[in-house]
Amino acid sequence: MRFWLLLITALFLAGCSSHRAPAPNARLSDSIAVIAGLNDQLQTWHGTPYRYGGMSRSGVDCSGFVLMTMRDKFDLQLPRDTRTQSKIGTEIAKDDLLPGDLVFFKTGSGESGLHVGIYDTNNQFIHASTSRGVMRSSLDNVYWRKNFWQARRI
């Protein structure tokens, strides 16, 4: 009898501790509007070359592109650098990604070894690539899959 009581209690407590990703910021809660905003930003910036520290159409880095996209399209203020951006919001599982979530990669060592983009849809994200400038990439790409570090919901 005691065994069954313990088993039922354990199952009940396990059910109470289910993992749920946090809800997105109210400005990012309408996935259709977020996708439209991201597509508009990508269309405007597509092909803009990568430039470390850049924040203009003549050159932009990954954290600058993320900062400007969130500010200009969703009225959200983010820190300027990738390391600090990687600490805001709540870490979420890759399987829980929604449009507007930030995706982070460890592509090298030190501060310059971090990369950030914004999850779009269908396992795609937009970002400023060091080799190809502002573009859309797939999280299924071997390079991005291998270097994926974390995802955050703001």
Can you name each region flagged by the protein language model?
Residues 42-50, 69-78, 107, 129, ...:
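Sec/Tat-exported extracytoplasmic proteins
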Residues 38, 42-60:
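Extracytoplasmic/periplasm-facing segments of secreted or lipoprotein envelope proteins
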